[in-house]
């Protein structure tokens, strides 16, 4: 049997900080293994205003989830919200040199990475880029184009943008709590992962930067 795959989510909210540990099953579903929750006193409207209090709350929530799940938590996927978060819609295009060669993961990744280069307002940074659909030679509605043939790959992306200082403060809290950041993801999307395994796949494969 292969080693279990665990996904850890951390919600840094205004009223509470919660940590949840899920095990990814062979069928793609997630089974909850542990949960921890503490009061949040260092966060207001999705922004950290007291580093020390927030770090302490993160440590306590993670410790509870770790004890309940019997999992040594070293990294987390952080759900974020707040007035400083906004989302943009962008389309990427890649013209291929050889239409008879199968579309590769490298090409799809290039389309995605190009989204991190789009122009945004000063003081903001791109938190995450989520592919919504692919268009191959003007044929829309394609979810997974890997292995297909075509001259042109297009993709519609959901680009999540946040205030740089707010994002850095969250990352700082995670690091001071002795954890690594796997992903930062918009809370409604993180909530949808409970029902959509494809979002869970995104959380385990997509990196913050």
Describe these PLM feature segments.
Residues 1-16, 20-208:
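Nucleotide/phosphate-binding catalytic cleft detector across ATP-hydrolyzing
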């Amino acid at each position: 049997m292969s080693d279990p795959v665990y996904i850890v989510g951390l919600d840094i909210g205004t009223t509470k900080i919660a940590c949840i540990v899920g095990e990814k099953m062979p069928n793609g579903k997630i089974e909850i293994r542990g949960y921890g929750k503490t009061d949040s006193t260092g966060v207001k409207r999705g922004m950290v205003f007291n580093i020390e209090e927030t770090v302490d709350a993160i440590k306590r929530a993670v410790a509870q989830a770790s004890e309940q799940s019997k999992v040594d938590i070293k990294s987390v996927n952080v759900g974020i919200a707040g007035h400083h978060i906004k989302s943009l819609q962008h389309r990427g295009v890649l013209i291929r040199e050889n239409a008879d060669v199968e579309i590769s993961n490298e090409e799809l990744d290039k389309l995605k990475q190009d989204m991190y280069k789009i122009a945004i307002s000063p003081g903001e940074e791109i938190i995450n880029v989520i592919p919504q659909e692919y268009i191959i030679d003007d044929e829309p509605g394609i979810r997974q184009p890997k292995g297909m043939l075509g001259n042109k790959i297009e993709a519609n992306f959901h680009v999540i943008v946040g205030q740089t200082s707010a994002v850095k403060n969250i990352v700082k809290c995670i690091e001071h709590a002795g954890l690594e950041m796997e992903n930062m993801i918009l809370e409604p999307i993180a909530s949808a992962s409970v029902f959509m395994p494809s979002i869970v796949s995104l959380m385990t494969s997509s990196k913050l930067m």
